């Protein structure tokens, strides 16, 4: 048996002040696709020199959130790998690469650097489980500078949504 006690529903948290410098609002990021996110992220990067996202290099959290938002996985129901012919995974990797090449997404080496990027203002957004709010609100000087929204969805995957999960706990 198990008892769930934590939720990992994915949120998009956006720095209002950084977006305003780019002529945008957090509402511009509501219910959007990844191609729109890339377009807006380029605008933010160009006008503020701030990337939209920071991720920890070598982790697959963002890819997994993308997959789950489209009802896909790297595993089949029988537990075997679902990689070679996984069209949604291919698209997720392409999006990640586009974000990275455009400077909209930057990689850091570890969790401490990831949290430091969020708390120092060197990233304009965070896409992660809602549990990340604790790390966001720990930076008291940024109080009132964040807005919560949902995550982007795939442009061309049937059934793709702006919702996913990253984590959760049980005992």
Predicted regions and their residues:
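Short, hydrophobic alpha-helical packing/hinge segments within bilobed ligand-binding/sensory domains
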Residues: 40-41, 96, 114-119, 123, ...
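Short helix-initiation/N-cap motifs at beta->coil->alpha
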Residues: 32-38, 106-120, 153
């Amino acid at each position: 048996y198990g008892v769930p006690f934590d939720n990992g529903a994915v949120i998009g948290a956006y720095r209002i002040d950084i977006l305003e410098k780019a002529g945008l609002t957090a509402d511009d990021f509501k219910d959007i696709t990844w191609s729109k996110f890339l377009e807006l992220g380029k605008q933010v990067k160009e006008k503020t020199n701030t990337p939209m996202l920071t991720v920890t290099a070598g982790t697959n959290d963002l890819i997994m959130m993308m997959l789950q938002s489209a009802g896909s996985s790297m595993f089949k129901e029988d537990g075997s790998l679902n990689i070679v012919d996984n069209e949604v995974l291919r698209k997720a990797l392409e999006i990640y690469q586009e974000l990275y090449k455009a400077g909209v997404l930057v990689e850091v080496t570890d969790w401490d650097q990831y949290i430091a990027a969020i708390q120092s203002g060197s990233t304009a957004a965070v896409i992660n489980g809602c549990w990340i709010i604790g790390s966001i609100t720990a930076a008291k000087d940024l109080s009132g500078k964040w807005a919560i929204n949902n995550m982007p969805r795939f442009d061309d995957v049937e059934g793709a949504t702006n919702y996913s999960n990253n984590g959760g706990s049980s005992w």
